[in-house]
């Protein structure tokens, strides 16, 4: 590849690290997350009554959309660049835009639905159900977040290195038989966010699903929550692909290796951020290690 791969890796890792230093969970979760959800619902999200399955599903979508830019969902934005790297003709640009989004949504829905059923049947015994706070150390639900997002972060980093041909690409052979495998895998990862998500409004939904004991409601609510998470991602992808797709595609293909660099950078920034934020910065809350942060909110 006619680029210095070390530079791409270094700058991407630096970008992911810088994002963890600057990230303000109170601002993103409360101001943006709660604010957007409350605006959609028309009342304070924290006081939203889920008196029926329909009300719960409406809350699920609103809180999913509101949680688009929370730390547990930021890795999903790394899915946009790999999708843009795919070839598509000018005449059928819109038609060719839909299958990648469809497979991404399918993978996401599969994991979300299964976990929704698990939450409905066994949720009262899972860490995400608990409202307890740890006076020192980490609560069980944060330990669960560390494990889930740590694994997701490492997977994203590996995919970034694979895009640069530094490690073997596990999807390359499958892609020849199933061209949309990468979109499906990204969907599976986005769906798995629910397994580790500590976002307050999501846990509010989780408790309602667990208390209901209704697997069908759990599946629908969790799929709807995940769909809300990717609305912004889908809009950005459609705008870049359809409205500016010709210019974007020409720019990506103008230089050999540019598509791979963009894909790798997106995966590496998202992966480094996800791993460092959830497995290193979070650990610093216990006092075991020190991690640099800039408090601005």
Question: Predicted regions: what is each one?
Answer:
Residues 1-297:
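Hydrophobic alpha-helical segments characteristic of multipass inner/organellar membrane proteins
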């Amino acid at each position: 590849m006619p680029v210095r791969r070390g530079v791409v890796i270094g700058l991407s890792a630096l970008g992911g690290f810088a994002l963890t230093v600057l990230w303000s969970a109170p601002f993103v979760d409360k101001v943006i997350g709660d604010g957007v959800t409350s605006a959609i619902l028309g009342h304070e999200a924290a006081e939203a009554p889920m008196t029926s399955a329909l009300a719960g599903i409406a809350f699920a979508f609103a809180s999913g959309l509101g949680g688009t830019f929370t730390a547990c969902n930021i890795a999903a934005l790394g899915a946009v660049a790999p999708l843009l790297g795919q070839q598509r003709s000018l005449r059928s640009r819109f038609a060719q835009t839909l299958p990648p989004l469809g497979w991404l949504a399918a993978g996401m829905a599969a994991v979300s639905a299964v976990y929704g059923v698990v939450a409905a049947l066994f949720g009262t015994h899972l860490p995400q159900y608990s409202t307890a706070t740890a006076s020192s150390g980490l609560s069980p639900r944060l330990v669960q977040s560390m494990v889930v997002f740590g694994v997701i972060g490492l997977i994203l980093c590996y995919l970034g290195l694979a895009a640069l041909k530094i490690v073997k690409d596990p999807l390359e052979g499958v892609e020849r038989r199933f061209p949309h495998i990468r979109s499906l895998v990204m969907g599976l990862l986005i769906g798995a966010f629910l397994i580790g998500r500590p976002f307050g409004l999501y846990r509010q939904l989780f408790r309602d699903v667990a208390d209901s004991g209704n697997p069908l409601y759990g599946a629908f609510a969790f799929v709807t929550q995940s769909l809300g998470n990717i609305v912004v991602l889908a809009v950005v992808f459609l705008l870049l692909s359809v409205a500016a797709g010709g210019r974007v595609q020409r720019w990506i293909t103008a230089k050999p290796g540019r598509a791979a660099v963009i894909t790798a950078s997106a995966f590496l920034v998202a992966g480094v951020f996800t791993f460092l934020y959830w497995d290193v910065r979070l650990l610093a809350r216990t006092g075991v290690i020190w991690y640099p942060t800039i408090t601005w909110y």
